[in-house]
Amino acid sequence: MSNSDKFFNDFKDIVENPKKYIMKHMEQTGQKAIGCMPLYTPEELVLAAGMFPVGVWGSNTELSKAKTYFPAFICSILQTTLENALNGEYDMLSGMMITNYCDSLKCMGQNFKLTVENIEFIPVTVPQNRKMEAGKEFLKSQYKMNIEQLEKISGNKITDESLEKAIEIYDEHRKVMNDFSMLASKYPGIITPTKRNYVMKSAYYMDKKEHTEKVRQLMDEIKAIEPKPFEGKRVITTGIIADSEDLLKILEENNIAIVGDDIAHESRQYRTLTPEANTPMDRLAEQFANRECSTLYDPEKKRGQYIVEMAKERKADGIIFFMTKFCDPEEYDYPQMKKDFEEAGIPHVLIETDMQMKNYEQARTAIQAFSETL
């Protein structure tokens, strides 16, 4: 086993046993843990309060109790998250930060508040017009409300110094993860889709400084190896989440490497650093204003062009759109993105996904056919 494989196996173990690692961290540090749901929750506030931010993106749990509170056409990320909460899977959490980026998330917050009484609901309400000064001031006012809740839960005061330190820790992590994504495009034979996912997904369950250092060490091991020509196909992936190992293994079976992504669960979290400003709160407001993401207000619909440019830069042969079933923002984006891809002459395929998928044969057929056309 190579040294890099040892790192990948460590990340894999964390991904497959997240609760074990979360509980271990809590026991070792004495910190309380706060759940952070999609998308762009201000985890820096949690860290500045001396607590442990934990990513919560659903699972492949079978639905039962959540069906009482959600209609069938709510995405499986939210349905399975509520199911897990109702089943006590998140009882180690002291709070859950829930955003309002889509209609389904708005429902999620209210349902969580109603049904999960032992975990405090922390609403993260963000402005649609995030770039104007009024939007920035509104966001800061909401973050201040979040700070009050987090201080009450933790018993710690969030100071400018602690928030500044948290921002620096997160920005350093963002830089390293961006570097890792770029490295994956240069070593597609080593950083396979499943191994790439282990690194990306494990970040949600680890201390950020620890994850940053571990990814750095992994990259050093890989950089010591001479890059070899890759005989397979290179693709860019886009969507909300694509963390199913069964699905990613289908890419590997067809000799397809992921050389870049516009996945909300992956690189979209990291591509916007925090600019300098007068105060730490100003910095967070400016960062949010600078985010270019179609799940936020994006009247110019630049997502397709962004992916086209990435595909050209990383010499991708095609694009795979992993469409989360019942995700309205994604479904609205697709027609314009399809047009952008076709005008650029870049082949693409749409694969519908669901957290509860058991049979991937339809996806297998589509991916195999797509690979053969590249």
Curated annotation (Swiss-Prot):
Its cofactor is [4Fe-4S] cluster. Its EC number is 4.2.1.175. GO terms for biological process: L-phenylalanine catabolic process; L-phenylalanine metabolic process. Appears to contain about 1 [4Fe-4S] cluster per heterodimer FldBC. Pathway: Amino-acid degradation; L-phenylalanine degradation. Keywords: 4Fe-4S, Iron, Iron-sulfur, Lyase, Metal-binding. It catalyses: (R)-3-phenyllactoyl-CoA = (E)-cinnamoyl-CoA + H2O; (R)-3-(4-hydroxyphenyl)lactoyl-CoA = (E)-4-coumaroyl-CoA + H2O; (R)-3-(indol-3-yl)lactoyl-CoA = (E)-3-(indol-3-yl)acryloyl-CoA + H2O. GO terms for molecular function: 4 iron, 4 sulfur cluster binding; hydro-lyase activity; metal ion binding. Part of the heterotrimeric phenyllactate dehydratase complex FldABC, composed of (R)-phenyllactate CoA-transferase (FldA) and a heterodimeric (R)-phenyllactyl-CoA dehydratase (FldB and FldC). Component of the phenyllactate dehydratase complex FldABC that is involved in the fermentation of L-phenylalanine via a Stickland reaction. This complex catalyzes the reversible syn-dehydration of (R)-phenyllactate to (E)-cinnamate in two steps, a CoA-transfer from cinnamoyl-CoA to phenyllactate, catalyzed by FldA, followed by the dehydration of phenyllactyl-CoA to cinnamoyl-CoA, catalyzed by FldB and FldC. Requires the activator FldI to initiate catalysis. Belongs to the FldB/FldC dehydratase alpha/beta subunit family. This is (R)-phenyllactyl-CoA dehydratase beta subunit. It comes from Clostridium sporogenes. The gene is fldC.
